[in-house]
Amino acid sequence: MKTIFHNANVITMDDARPRAEAVAVENGRITALGSDADVLALKSRAALIDCRGGALLPGLVDAHIHLLAYAASLISVDCSPAAVSSIAEIQDALRRGAAHTPAGRWIRATGYDETALAERRHPMRWDLDAAVPDHPVRLIHRSGHASVLNSLALALAGVGIATEEPPGGYMERDLTTGEPTGLLMEMDALLDAAVPRIDDAELAQAVRRASDNLLSEGVTAVQDATATNGPDEWQTFRRLIVEGHLRLPVTVFEGYESLGKLPRQALGGRLRRGPVKIAISELGGEIAPGEGELAAMVWQAHRRGRQVAVHAIGQRAVHAAVRAIEEALRRKPRRDHRHRIEHCGVCSPDLAKRIGALGIAVVSQPSFLYHSGDRYLKNVPREDLPHLYPFGDLLRAGGRLAAGSDAPVVPPRPLLGIQTAVTRAGRLGAVLSPQQSLDVAQALLMHTRDAAWSAFQDDERGSIEPGKRADFVLLSNDPASVPPDEIADLDVEMTVLAGQIAWPPSSRRST
């Protein structure tokens, strides 16, 4: 059936035709766009949806999320800065969680940030023991790169004084006894093997909530950037889509350890294989994998014709990622490789120029500046602050930027990401490196066309053009027409997937 969305301020993100008033859709694809008069002339047997003057944009693309972890966080004990401000409050939250959890069953808690706690330190096993002695507890850091376990959980995981850290991992120990304090960094492989997975029914319920949350924010496609994705995770995503719990199309990054094990796509493109994910950890001034091993990993993916996505935050890691990609391209040039650096937290102007010259995409998180800006001002070395999430430098160097939330690290709120890319303002109002600000059009590109481009999907989504998927978000106003610090307050009035209103569920706007 044909549908026409009319009386809209259509912001197409297509340079050849940036604006329109109406869009016609059939069989999930855009068939026409133009003035109301021109498109409504095609209205025979069409359903009409009156957009009432709102801004109709391409559906927003979250180019870096951890979807299963985000879903799990929705059914975990909330220890985020919005929920707790001290270790005592973490203990209270865990006690509440334990009150309706059978003894002996694992308790999962997420989102703590030691810099937002009154004590300004990580909780330790003994803090958790005092609150919940009869349940194993895994308390996951906001970053996803650290966990604190209580004594029962450490015992079940087989972690003790004789345990050796894996390469790139770190286990904090009591300086006197050598006993683990419970804080483990970059040791997910060990923990994931020890901690029982969420059962299928719980996961399905959580993913349905996560999917609805994303749709309510105007997100119509996601890229799951989890470094441990493999065949099991692929099958999980496939099942969740088939059973109707996950309504969004998903691009699944392939963890390096699973290189070559995932199919290209399934379910008519609703599930796709993305780039090969390689994560660089940065602990104690060292990076892991080291530069030689990293270069070999990038080469193994590149020589197979694959795209890589390298997690690199600090400047040393970013530099190593650039060198590895540069070397792979020297050995085997490839014009449209679209290799990616995920995050790119600190990057000098010279390094930004190399990134631009090599055609590397940077997929970053503007919302981090909002949620952590005040912490960055306190903790980031002064000489690095001008180069913190340097979106302006990267674009001036000819680079391309895409945006993701990195949820559950921060909530998936793309309008806040767009706002923060423009304002560079933290939650308490401090502005970080204003010379790195973008204009609204550039910030929108990060969340639409260039986010799709970063996964080789700009032929399908990211702009409103005939032939592309009819994925839209209807906003209450044009983001460029409101004060920049009010962009996040715009209402998402409608989210459309393949021509069908996906959010709100019962919304039907017609004349």
Q: What are the residue ranges of the model-derived segments?
A:
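Short, glycine-/Ser/Thr-/acidic-enriched flexible segments
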Residues: 30, 38, 54, 114, ...
